[in-house]
Structures are given as C-alpha cells and as structure tokens.
Swiss-Prot record:
Annotated region described as Necessary for interaction with RAD51, given as residue ranges: 175-469
Protein name (database record): DNA repair-scaffolding protein
Gene coding for it: Spidr
Main location: nucleus
Chain spans, region Disordered: 1-34, 67-174, 205-224
UniProt biased composition (Acidic residues): 138-148
Species for this entry: Mus musculus (Mouse)
Presence of keyword Secreted: no
Subunit structure: Found in a complex, at least composed of BLM, RAD51 and SPIDR; the complex formation is mediated by SPIDR. Interacts (via C-terminal region) with BLM; the interaction is direct. Interacts with RAD51; the interaction is direct. Interacts (via the C-terminal region) with FIGNL1 (via N-terminal one-half region); the interaction is direct.
Amino acid sequence: MSGARRPGTSKRKRNWHIEHPSFREERSQQLRRGNFKTVEAADSLSKAWLKCGEGFQDTSEILSLASEKTGITEKHLELSPKPKTETTSKNASELPNIIWSSSESDFSDEDKTLPALQRDGRHGPRADRLGDRTISCPEDEDIEDELQVIDWEVNSDKEDPGGPSECEDDKGTLDISDCDSCASLTSDDRLCEPSEPISTEILEYSSDSEKEEDPEHSLFIDSESPHKYQADFKSDARWCLVSQTDSEANSAEPTLTPQKYTVKFPKTPEYSVTKKKLLRGGLAERLQELQNRKRSAISLWRHRCVSYQMTPLGRKSGVLTVKILELHEECSMQVAVCEQLAGPPITSPPGGLAPRPGAYLKVLFTRETADHLMGHPQDIIYIFPPWQKLLIPNGSCSIILNTYFCQKAIAKETVREDLYSPDISLSRRNITLAQTFRIKDITDNSSINQTTYDSLATPGTGWTHGHEKAEQHLIVAAPLRNSLLDIVESQRAGLWSGVRVQVVVQRVYSLLSRDGARSQQGHTVGHADASGAWSCLLVQDACGMFGEVFLNSTLWKSRQLEGKSCSMSGVKVLQKATRGRTPGLFSLIDSLWPPVISLTEPSCGQPSGETKTYLPPPIFCYIFSAHPTLGQIDAIEDHISKLYQPPVVRCLKEILQTNECSTRCSFYARVIYQKPQLKNLLAQKEIWLLVTDITLQTQDERDHSLPKTLPVYIAPSCVLGPEVVEELALLVSYNLLFRDAFKDNGQIVCIERTVILPQKPLLCVPSASCDLPSPVTLDELSALTPVNSICSVQGTVVDVDESTAFSWPVCDRCGNGRLEQKPEDGGTFSCGDCSQLVLSPLQERHLHVFLDCPTRPESTVKVKLLESSISLLLMSAASEDGSYEVESVLGKEMGPLLCFVQSITTQQSSCVVTLEEIELLSTEGATAAQPPP
C-alpha cells in the first residue's frame, strides 16, 4: 500500500488526551533534538511489565525506554495498528477530564521545570499533534536532565506523502523485540526495512528459564508478511529491532546476531499434551511476580518503619502529612477525610474554584494498609511517595491514591477516649453505582442501599468540601444475621464487629486464661474471676457453625443463657481454631453433632431456605471475645431453642459398656475417696476422685467385667467452682454431676470445658430406691486392677521393710508431730501450736509390710499400713523393752484392707504392686447418687 493517506478517511483521536504510563527504572539516557526522526526502541517489554506496578506516572509523548539487560528469554511481538477512520464524537469531547498527577512529579518536585518539549521549541508542533497536555514524571532529582524523546513517525510528519513510513494509519507494522544484546550494537550494525501491510498472529511462548539448548522450544510467528521470523528461546540467538540514524532510511528491519539454525515446530494441542512441561503464557506469571514484588516491597517498608523511626525530610521529600477528620468504609476500602498539614501544595481544583485556607483531602486506604495503620480520628498520618492525586472536575476535594507506604504519628493533642475510642468500629456504607452516577432510571429506594451498619448507631457524616457541609446518613440498627461468618467478614483487625448474629448457647463453662489469649484480648477486655478463669459460651448459629465466646460477666449469670436463642454483637475474633490445635473443643462439638433440626444456608438478612443434606462435622470454628462495655449477648426468647442439645446424663454402667472412644459423657456419681486431700480452696492440682453409683454397686458379683468403683481424673485445666472446692475440702462423701467429661480408652478424665456441679437431692424420687449399700463394696486386688483405683486386699505378712519402720511422738490434743523436748523440765515435751506441755504424747508409727495375696500369687504386694492396722499387728509382738522383732509379725494374716493402688512396677522376673491403706469418706449427711431419669 502507498504511504499516502487519503484525506478525511483516517484521523487520529487527538482529543482523548491519551497519556502513556511510564514505569520506574526506565529512565532516559540522553536528550535528542527534533532533527532525529527515529530512536532506538530496544527496551525489554518484560522489564516494563515487571515494573508496571510500582506506580503509574502520566506522560504525554515522552516515553523512556532504557537499554538494560534483562537476562530472560526473548519475546517478539509484531504490532499492527488498525486504521482509525472514525472521528472524535461530540460526546467524547464533552467527557470530564480526569487529571492524574504523581507524588514524584508536581507534588514531590513542584519547582522542577518541564524538560525536553518545553525547552526545545522545535518539538512544539509534535506535542500539539499528540496531545494538548504534558505532565512531567521525573523519578529522581539527579537524573532529571537525562531524558530521552521518542519521535513516533506518522504520516503527517512526512514531507513526502508517497514515501514509506514507519507507522501508517491505514496498515502498518511495528516490530518490537526483547533482547540482551541490542544495547551493545552500534549504528553501523543497525538495519532498517520498509514495513509492509501485514496481519499479525501472536502465539504463546515458553516461560521456561532453562539454559540448555532445546530446538523443540522454538517459537514460530507466522504472518502474511513475506518476512517470517523464528525465535529460539533455548539458544543464544538474539533478535533486536533498531532504528537507523541515517536520514535516508525511514524503516526498521530485524537483525539476527548471531545466526543459529533451529528446527521449527508449530504449536498444536497434541504437541502441548506430549510435553512434560506445558508451555504457559507469561502474562499471568508476570502478574504474579508483580504482585509478589509489590507485597515484598510493602512488607520491607513496614519492617523499616518498625526498626527505624522514619520522619519526613521536609517539603522536598514529597511526604504528605495529613490529619484524619472522619473515617468510614466503602467497598472494603477505608475512606479517610483528612486535612493537609504539610507536604506539597494541593493545586486548585478545576472549574476555577478559589482554594480555601486549609486543603481537605479524601485518602483511600486498602484493607491491609488500614489494618497496619489502625488509624482513628485526630491521628496524624505520614504518606510517603509514590502516592497519587486524583482531581475530578466539579468534585468536592482531591483524592489521594496509592497510599501503601504510610506511617502513623503520635498526635500532640490529647484525644478524648469517650469520643474516639479505639474499640469503636467504623461505619459501613453501601453505595450503589446508581447513587454515585445519579442514574434516575433505577428507582431502588430500598433501605438496604441507604443503610449504614454501625454497631454503635452513631451518626456518620459525609464530607463535601471541608467542614462547611456535612451530609447525615441514615443510621438504623444492624439486621440480625444467621451466620457467625458475618462477624469474621466484617471485622477489622484490632476493632470490634457490630454485626448482630442470632446464636443458640449450647454450653456454659469456665476456662483458665492463657498468656496467648490474654495478649490477643488486650488489657481492655476485662478481668477474670478470683481463680483466674474466664466465663465462656459455646454458641452455634442456624447454619451449624460453632464459636467460643469469652465473656466478662460472672458465670452464674451466663448459665441462665444456656439453651436459649440469643443475639450476639460487639465481639471480635481472637483466633481460628482447628481440630489439630484444640482437640478438646472439637471433642465437645462432636458430642453436639449432628444437629437435631435442619440447618439453614447463610444469608445476609434475607430469607434462607432449609437444607436437609448430610453435613460432615465442622473442621474449624472461631474463638471470639466480647467487648467489656459494647459486647451484648441477650436472650431473644425465654423458652429453650429447638437447636439446643442438653447433655445426656447416663449411668456409669452404661458408659463403661459402650465401646465409644474419645467421646464426651455426663453422669451422676458419689465420691467415696479423693486423693490428695485439699486443705485450702486455692490449692488446685491433679486430683483423683473414686466414684460409684447404684448401677455399679448392685451388679452381679460373678460379673467381673465391670468394676465396683471408677477412678475419675481431674486435670489442672479443668476449672472447679467454689462450691465444688468446698465439697472437696470436707471429709464426707458427696454427690457430683459431671457434665461433658472425656472418656478415652475406658478412663474418664475431666479436662477443659468439663463442668462439675454439686448434685441437688431429687425430692420426687424415694431415697430408699437409690441408696448405696453400706458399706460400699470394693473389688478385690487382681491382675485387672488399674493404677489409681481402690481395692480390697487380704494376705499373709511375709516380710517387713525395716528401712521405713519408725515412730515419733505427737501432741495428744492437736496431733502436732513437731514437739520440743526441754531438759530443764525433766525431758517433757511441749507443743508449739498448743503452747502447753504434753504430758502423755501419742506415738505415730510408719510401717510397710509385704503380703502374699492369693489373688496375685506371682506379684509382690507392698502395703503402707495405717496406724490402726499397725497397732493391731504389733499388739502381740512387743518385747519387754518395748522393741519389736520382725520374726514376731511374720506369718500373720492381714485384711481385708481398703487400699489405694499407687503404682504397679513390672520387673524382669516379678511384679511389685505398691498399695496404701485408706479410709473411705464418711457417708454422714450424704445422699445417694441418683440415676438418670
């Protein structure tokens, strides 16, 4: 085709103010004058794509292309601009111009002069053809003069309209090649070629980075042009496109240096399947690299802010200092209305409006930046470059974008905590596009589009131009949601969610405060009770999701909420719990699964249908913390919810006969012995309770599969109420209700989230039908007797442990064993506790004997005897001088003795069973353990 352009058929759109974005680190190398018709275009497109996310800076016709070695595979593109025949419409010319300016241009260096075009008058006509506005984008002050002008040759620039051109409006081709060696070429090595009207087909290319040569990875670009080029991404071949500096040459031609012959393989779907590594497009990979580099840059900058105190270096630094006046949230972005305190001056808004004394800005923060800043009204924020300013014609104020690098300063003035509490959540505004663009055709006046979800129901203000005009938004109570996930989605880091969710309280219990939970809740969450425990609720929503809520109220008030449907608001997420992290919590959740009624699907305030499909047990849940003043958990209904599952109380016989492992169980039982004895209410340690009920005591004596008594281990993580601790301090038998105890491998353990309550006597049940036999029957010592259990022992004394046999005097009044003997008083003893002389002290003795038990003939049974048994054993074995001979006690029968199994040690040839003789708790004043109704 001829290079001549038909008048009136093809025109450029010059009124769209097309601005070419430039990328960082693509700086000019030299300043070229107007007599240069061509310029070197050998920069790497991959470099531009890799750097495109560091901030867009607007330019008009100035496009810097730096010749830097990229060290990656070559990318060859043939661009064919299509003819532009349409003219600029009237509506297009009437569109408002949005002026973009960067913090590194007129904001950061406002005193810099526009280079190149403004200093060289010969470029004026060209600037008029490409656009009517120029914006300078200097990167640094030290390279502000190293700018390069690229002249894009068009038909209107040619003196000879019939001659060839580099780029034609009708049909043209611009070949751009990415290479490593084009920067080292001289002007003599640069060749040009007249462009021909061709169409381009761009195939996918390999993104592999292997350095080995493989002809199978060659890329073939086919087009209608007689010039067909081949690029080998696995070889050292380099294609480069250069522009000839000679004025007689007006075209460009690709040059191959050095020449290498490869085999061409067209890309087909069958070919891609046979490859071990699929050839992928590089755009997605480069976008991922760009996002990773962006996140890395932000993380590194925040780390520097924490390590070093970064302060603005004055006006030249381009740091914008603002003061937050009002905050709200729109479309997951935090919008801050700020007052500019320092930094580059704000230009006058378009429309000829006079600037006001004190510039007001709207600063947009992303969710990650807002979580890092945790800004509040009256806070001072430093916004470091590169930030961008957006001026909207007829707009209220300027908008600051690209605020990734921000730092909060400590405000000098004292802010009242009652007005700007850090625990107050931001107002949430749902703004539709119809309201933004004032579309009258859409007549959706529903309250959902005009609702501000604010947990405090405080009025929000929409800023227009400073403080003069404030638009009041409609504030209504937050709708009642049905999913706990709404709290998670609406919560901001460090803030409290104002979403109201309807939940059912399944369990109420206490948990010991941990250091991790205390640090996450902070010092303002409240305080635990005297024992250092927190009141907790296990709640479940209508969708089946569980959550654990830390409260600040007393436990007895929280127990009134169990089983009721409640409204929960003013909470925040402490952590996400999984089965691996909190197995105790999920063992309790598994006991409540599956639900007794059909669940509903999550919905945002709209009707939701029930789902009856089978749902697996949940694999995660959330742990919440209620605000000390704003947190509210109120009962909606007085009656018990249908979703509530009360603990199923069963008898001990039924629990032991089930083969379920790692499950929760609830039962009534009477405590007949405890070890150790608690003498004060604060001494909580590992406790073993020996319990029984009527079902174990009345079973057939010939059935030895079930024990008569059962040991229950109370772990230190199990919180005991004050009423239970008082029961443990008494030396009487008592009845307890064990809720949600953990059964594992036939052993019952009270762990965290297990509730132990004193049992109240049931008046409706006759006591005679449930009374335990007196005395309580125990199992005999056998090979099946476990450790930490009680049993009955009977046998013959075969030996005495003389190393542990001794006696000492004690006070006959108080039993104090630390008596003082005074020689001046004739060797009498005195008690320090009673402050009196002990005339007839009692003798306490300590003795271990070895028994030969017929129930365990192959084992050595060692028993620590009580004082009563020692006195009975030594009654007839005393000599005239008061000493005892070992031979006098051997062969005597002992028993039956009630003993606690301390340990069972298995050696190579024998087994040693260590027992301790005990006394069961008194049954005076105790009622029988009631079976479940």
